[in-house]
Amino acid sequence: MHLSELSHPNELHGLSSSELEDVARQIREKHLKTVSTSGGHLGPGLGVVELTLALYQTLDLDHDRVVWDVGHQAYPHKLITGRFNEFHTLRKKDGVAGYLKRSESSFDHFGAGHASTSISAALGMAIARDRQGQNHKCVAVIGDGALTGGMALEAINHAGHLPKTRLLVVLNDNDMSISPPVGALSNHLNRMRLSPPMQFLTGSAEEAVRHLPFMQGQVPAELNRIKEGMKRLAVPKVGAVFEELGFTYMGPVDGHDIGALVRTFQEAHRSEGPVLVHVATTKGKGYPYAEADQVGYHAQSAFDLTTGKSFPAKKPKPPSYSKVFGQTLVKLCEQDSRIVGITAAMATGTGLDLLQKAVPDQYVDVGIAEQHAVTLAAGMACDGLKPVVAIYSTFLQRAYDQLIHDVGIQKLPVTFVLDRAGIVGADGPTHQGQYDISYLRCVPNFTVMAPKDEAELQRMLVTGLRHNGPIALRIPRGSGEGVPCLEDGWEPLEIGRGELLAEGDDLLIVAYGAMVAPAMATAGLLQEQGIRATVVNARFLRPLDEALLVPLAKRIGRVVTMEEGCLAGGFGAAVMEALHDRDVLVPMLRLGIPDQLVDHASPDESKQALGLTPPQMADRICERFGSAFGDRLQRQTLSV
């Protein structure tokens, strides 16, 4: 069967192991070809090809439910659920999403993008099934990295107390989440993987037998029986932790042996209660470069399949904000042993991998445990350390109670660096950093700021570390503005003071963070039409520089705010409230993300769709205030 002919996963029923292996080969070829061209998650999907095929051969996907944790490993799932012919549009605007979306396919039973949610969702489906007298199967597929998340453990604890509720949890254990997983549970799983029977199961012994001249590529049944016996005898406590929590434990199973997987899943489906099947896989399986560098090939931009190297940029780019942050933090840590960098399993993405290599004693990775990361930092701050929590804007949402209860209320000096703040692009709505402005500006005692460029980022980091209270700094995804960075001697900013960048009498533009450069470009376009704008780099969301903004708004009489975040409760709303409280009631235009989700596309495409490019913003300003500008407006449409 050719993969392109597979329109429904139930068509896998009845295929032999060799036929499934041929489908697996085609999936890997398509997966590699597509990701090498368009970019995307590489290693996770390559590691679960056989797992996916074997699982789906034992299910009826018209009725049964499968919840994939995170969803970045579900490319094989997409390829066998009718999206083969559209797969070349992966992560592109209006194309196939990089994660699971209920709106994209009836086979995407639960959407995701964040880790550790699958067991809770699948258990909820199982309870709904039982209450409605139905009989379909409910399955959660979760990686060993996501299993470190507290939510996953909460769900396991709950499911274990429901002995009559049929639930299958498939643990995809590749000893890798994005960065290597940490913690006692991960260490326990690792001991399982490194036990002699497990090494025999997944190591070179079977391959050596298969290649003996007289074996003709086959493995005798006796060897399989020996392997199973060794597992039972030498690793009797492998699943003890899950058995104690109320699950029937099966495994470990070779995650690339389709026959063994099918037999195990069939046995698991016969159980009357919760079952955990432990599957040992290799992240990046089938592509040597991805197997050798499982962190580097977790996700990739477009790359050369032959060499495994990313294609060079068409023109040199400035360093990313993440890299500038990481390099600066390393230097600050070298100067002050009290500074500690904390990540929640995202060291590479946030730039903290640089700290891990340079000053490992001042680096902490808590795993996928954002709530713990925040309160851990609070505890450190209580006793004299200077914690810096580097975390994606979208993931900090998961620790909101800790921000308020453990840090804000107690006014503890913790510095938060929110990476990927604003529009992030192809990862789509689960990863857009569009909410942090709104959810941070109301937290008591917090100072909130955003830099206009790399050099200002460095100064803000120093500001945070010298401030005796909680402070949050948001930085966008991608390259900086190309402003030279200082090697040392960074001066802190005066908290609550903005920066006047340009002066004009017709319009006041107040921009925040990544929107400062577009604001200046917009002002330049307006200047060409005879409109002179004052431009302010707000720097601080909380506290706002009311001493600067109020007199300017009162004098100029027309205000535009620009932000890369939600308009609801956002930066523009903060400016409007501040002016209103001072009885400055002037016409305003707030530019940002309206009340909608931002779907997957490139950042530039998303900004175009939202009307946030400089030509579009200039046009919107002219439409809003055109009559007030009178004869000075040399009207022409700038956005095309």
UniProtKB/Swiss-Prot annotation:
Protein name, per record? 1-deoxy-D-xylulose-5-phosphate synthase
- What are the EC numbers? 2.2.1.7
**Which proteins does it associate with, and in what oligomeric form?**
Homodimer.
UniProt function note: Catalyzes the acyloin condensation reaction between C atoms 2 and 3 of pyruvate and glyceraldehyde 3-phosphate to yield 1-deoxy-D-xylulose-5-phosphate (DXP).
The entry's cellular-component GO terms read:
cytosol
Record note on cofactor: Binds 1 Mg(2+) ion per subunit. Binds 1 thiamine pyrophosphate per subunit.
Q: Which UniProt keywords apply?
A: Isoprene biosynthesis, Magnesium, Metal-binding, Thiamine biosynthesis, Thiamine pyrophosphate, Transferase
Q: Which cofactor does it need?
A: Mg(2+); thiamine diphosphate
Return the InterPro entries for the record. Dxylulose-5-P_synthase (IPR005477), THDP-binding (IPR029061), Transketo_C/PFOR_II (IPR009014), Transketolase-like_Pyr-bd (IPR005475), Transketolase_BS (IPR020826), Transketolase_C (IPR033248), Transketolase_CS (IPR049557)
Q: Can you name the source organism? A: Synechococcus sp. (strain RCC307)
